[in-house]
């Protein structure tokens, strides 16, 4: 039973470890931005810091870029409004949590959150190849280009937080361009793109004009996008988590039934061992009786002392009749024991033989007292 408890504890520990890791860690809060982490210059954004451990006091700090004086050692309750944003607000942020009873002790830092500020450069242009309207299953490529020497282009779709990025490549017409292949078109959507420089990766240009991609032959042409790597990655991650949890549950069930089978087998073996000695004793008694078929009870006869009588003549014999001499035999006391039928028959035969021997001896003694005629 102790092995079963240890196994259950191990399985529960690994499952909880996976769940906590998926949610951000055991003692780390979760930092997010609303409505989006991509904020236009002069706009506002709300940063939310949440925790499963009941933290109510949070501290926000910036890891890179230009420090923001109003955020230095800023203490807040669960959320903080940041803005109007400037290029100085662009960068990576983290938060820590604490309890009011122990404000000196802080939790581990949260997940990193990147705040992007847009509207710092001129906007690029976005186009679709072979066109903004395609058939279902047809390959679509979106091209983002500009005459500004951008180092990187970022593609954004309305309603999606993930922005794929590609380096800008000089083209023949003197522009800097990046092509985003979307694969076979299944659903449409509205797209924009941004440009940035290596020195300031979180400071983007103005967004391009929105481009609506339509897919013919599909009733929900504007409900979702063509096939994107981000959706595939999310599906795979959730699938891996589901498979791992299912395997852990199956292994736990197999281990449980195996331990149950072992316990039942041990109890059955113990019951059999308890019953074996009585049976062995019965068999041994029967064997002891059967293994001694030739046991015979013998009668031990003491040495008989015969009285020698002197033979006298008839004239010298007394007038009174002589006293008969009787011989006695003493048999040693023996404890009675139960005999088998064969033993009883053999003992009766011996006793009959003994009686005949005794009678013969008495006859011989009696004959010795008969007077000899003519002596």
Curated annotation (Swiss-Prot):
GO terms for cellular component: plasma membrane. Disulfide bonds join 49-95, 144-193. Its main location: membrane. Residues 42-102, 137-200 form the Ig-like C2-type domain. This is Killer cell immunoglobulin-like receptor 2DL5A. The lineage of its organism: Eukaryota, Metazoa, Chordata, Craniata, Vertebrata. The gene is KIR2DL5A. Residues 22-238 are extracellular. PANTHER family: KILLER CELL IMMUNOGLOBULIN-LIKE RECEPTOR 2DL5A-RELATED (PTHR11738:SF169), MHC CLASS I NK CELL RECEPTOR (PTHR11738). Keywords: Cell membrane, Disulfide bond, Glycoprotein, Immunoglobulin domain, Membrane, Receptor, Repeat, Signal, Transmembrane, Transmembrane helix.
